[in-house]
Amino acid sequence: MAEGGFTHNQQWIGPEEAEELLDFDIAVQMNEEGPLNPGVNPFRVPGITSQEKDDYCKILQTKLQELKNEVKEVKIEEGNAGKFRRARYLRYSDENVLSIVYLLIGYLRYLIDHRSLGSLRHDIDIETPQEEHYNNSEKGTTLNIKYGRRCCISTFIMYLILFAGVGIWLGARAQVVWRLPPLVVPVDDTEIIFWDCWAPEEPACQDFLGTMIYLKANVNISIQEGPTLGNWAREIWSTLFKKATRQCRRGRIWRRWNETITGPLGCANNTCYNISVVVPDYQCYVDRVDTWLQGKVNISLCLTGGKMLYNKETRQLSYCTDPLQIPLINYTFGPNQTCMWNTSLIKDSEIPKCGWWNQVAYYDTCKWEEANVTFQCHRTQSQSGSWIRTISSWKQRNRWEWRPDFESEKVKISLQCNSTKNLTFAMRSSSDYYDVQGAWIEFGCHRNKSKRHSEARFRIRCKWNEGNNISLIDTCGTNPNVTGANPVDCTMKANTMYNCSLQDSFTMKIEDLIVHFNMTKAVELYNIAGNWSCTSDLPKGWGYMNCNCTNGTDNSETKMACPKNQGILRNWYNPVAGLRQALIKYQVVKQPEYLIVPEEVMQYKFKQKRAAIHIMLALATVLSMAGAGTGATAIGMVTQYHQVLATHQQALEKITEALKINNLRLITLEHQVLVIGLRVEAIEKFLYTAFAMQELGCNQNQFFCKIPPSLWSMYNMTLNQTIWNHGNISLGNWYNQTRDLQNKFYEIIMDIEQNNVQGKTGIQQLQKWENWVGWIGKIPQYLKGLLGSVLGIGLGILLLLICLPTLVDCIRNCTNKILGYTVIAMPEIDDEEVHLSVELRRNGRQCGISEKEEE
């Protein structure tokens, strides 16, 4: 087709192909570093008709042909995808370019009119005698003075009118929007919070991070429904242990044990059996478990996505929490545990809603409850053992020391402990791997350093299965008719001494093996012999699951009923509840994108005493929370706030640099992918709103934007000056009061983006601009041609200068040969000798021979 000046080799580009080409154009521009040029695809505007698409094709046909050629030339692996960088730069710096052009034009005009302006001067010099003097009235006014005064007065009036016009224009009624105000506000309940875990070389992070999905954004961080209690806690306990000892499964972990078993006649007749067994090296596990049994893990939880944590106690902003001491306390469950957060999830009617088999009791409500209890234990020298003779280092002579018998059963009951509260615990038929049955309580107990004992921390277990028949199940009741039960009272009464023991062994399943770990030697190192006492060091926030116990409708006396006085306590660590307890002092906040402020903010003067926003900013009283006063409630936040913003910006820059250099190859971890996703989402949002912000008069480098009155009045956005009260209001309260205005401002942006007329106008303006600056894209070609010409001319001149003498001689010889002359060069002689004449010989003529003789 020849329409629009196309050649026969170019084909008309239709709407479908044009839509893909414009998408390519926008995608190419997104490959560059920001800020990006906003791109709008007119073919994707809602409600566009086929006729409008054809019109767009006619308008943009030239640009589409260029884009089509660009698609053919682009090779992503060569890194030449972005070819509009220069045009985008001029697009964003058009104001500066025009200012420079205007300045240049004005200066040239001055140079051109300089002589004509000088001709207006009429200098008249009147010679007067020196003895004569004239006053000012007698001197009069020369033309220079008269025209100079007129020029000054007219210039002053002109600038006065100009400044007055500018002041009137700037002072026109408009709404001020503060972009990225320096304050933080609480997040909405509907917003999604992305958490990350930070604990160097600590495998427990991933387990606790998995529970964070049940935390939602709220002023007081709350929890949602969770999985089954028993399965959840059991899985966490097993997973934490496996990860804590994962180093034991690397390298030389397995040892080979070779044994030869002989028969009655020795090895005759092939009666020997060679046995080779591969066993794990348990010493590695023992070393790590000894430390792990102390039961504390230091982790920090961090926020991503631009949100921050506000500490209500210290009034500081941070991205991560303080290190949380998560206790790895064991738990107590009954057999066949079925208790869930939401009992409606249990569909089987035969399964109790929350309880155990062979009992009529079930628990309808379980909630986390802080324990606020203290355990005290003491030990007296009463267990079996033996005295051995050893060398004393401090008396320099032999003495007898007591060594307890750790294999004795009495060692396990040699401790007496009590609690400060009545605690009724649930029972169970077995633990994870059949090491303990019944009901029990576990806690850490700290012993201070003394003269005879070193500082140590023990893990103590108190249980209630020391009956006549320990094979029966402790049911924590007094009904003897329960089948297979050993009725005991599972209530640990306050201020009552109970026999307890050190947890010196435990059983754990490692891969496919059930392994029993004997920690006797490790406990012996603590020097438990003698008399000593310890106090529980339960971390703050440690507690139980307190469940209300209700008897069912079954009146069978062979099933265990609920305790008489209170519900059942489950001694286990709930990650969600523990995190909730640790995070209760934090509040999730964010920095708003826009804040609607009165025009009074733009008219602020430093000497005024009213508390406008600038005064708050100048005094560094950035108010962060809703309801805070206008005083210095957040003075300490400012420094850290700027550090947080700087750190966040540096992180984004590093991630962007990693994207450009490694082409997404470094982004392998989940939290990095999450941050990248948020970054891409922010870029898309910026692309979507940049055009509307330009239409509203907001430059990306401006912090204050003034919205035209026409758009402002169209949406009925009026500010309540009574609430503002000349700035005597906190920023947090002002943000909450004007939240509806923020939403309306978003509506203005969305309407401008989706408005077909505005989009078409913007495209036409962009097309005109590209027509004006289209020659810029040809600059490299011009430079190549110019450089080639300069190099060619310079090389030609250089060759000419080098070869010029030879060329002159050649031309001279050729000329003489054509004319028939030969140059005879005579040798040089001294000045004193007689100068010999040099004659030319023509056609064989010789010197001294006449023509006649020659003939």
From Swiss-Prot:
Q: Which GO terms describe its biological process?
A: symbiont entry into host cell; virion attachment to host cell
Which residue ranges are assigned to the Extracellular compartment in the record's topology? 1-784
User: Sorted alphabetically, which keywords does the UniProt record give?
Assistant: Cleavage on pair of basic residues, Coiled coil, Disulfide bond, Glycoprotein, Host cell membrane, Host membrane, Host-virus interaction, Membrane, Transmembrane, Transmembrane helix, Viral attachment to host cell, Viral envelope protein, Virion, Virus entry into host cell
Q: Where is this region: Fusion peptide?
A: 615-635
Sections of the chain in a coiled coil: 642-692, 735-771
Q: Which CDD domains match?
A: HIV-1-like_HR1-HR2
List of glycosylated residues: 135, 220, 258, 269, 274, 298, 330, 336, 342, 372, 418, 422, 448, 469, 481, 499, 518, 531, 548, 551, 716, 720, 728, 736
| Region named Immunosuppression | 661-679
- Bilayer-crossing residues are 785-805
Q: Where is this site: Cleavage?
A: R610, A611
GO CC, sorted alphabetically, is: host cell plasma membrane; membrane; viral envelope; virion membrane
Side Cytoplasmic, residues? 806-855
> So which domain of life are we looking at?
Viruses
* Pfam families on file: Env-gp36 (PF09590)
Molecular-function annotations in GO: structural molecule activity
Modification after translation (UniProt)? Specific enzymatic cleavages in vivo yield mature proteins. Envelope glycoproteins are synthesized as an inactive precursor that is N-glycosylated and processed likely by host cell furin or by a furin-like protease in the Golgi to yield the mature SU and TM proteins. The cleavage site between SU and TM requires the minimal sequence [KR]-X-[KR]-R.
Q: Subunit notes for this chain?
A: The mature envelope protein (Env) consists of a trimer of SU-TM heterodimers attached by noncovalent interactions or by a labile interchain disulfide bond.
| Its job | The surface protein (SU) attaches the virus to the host cell by binding to its receptor. This interaction triggers the refolding of the transmembrane protein (TM) and is thought to activate its fusogenic potential by unmasking its fusion peptide. Fusion occurs at the host cell plasma membrane. The transmembrane protein (TM) acts as a class I viral fusion protein. Under the current model, the protein has at least 3 conformational states: pre-fusion native state, pre-hairpin intermediate state, and post-fusion hairpin state. During viral and target cell membrane fusion, the coiled coil regions (heptad repeats) assume a trimer-of-hairpins structure, positioning the fusion peptide in close proximity to the C-terminal region of the ectodomain. The formation of this structure appears to drive apposition and subsequent fusion of viral and target cell membranes.
Name assigned to this protein: Envelope glycoprotein gp150
The encoding gene is: env
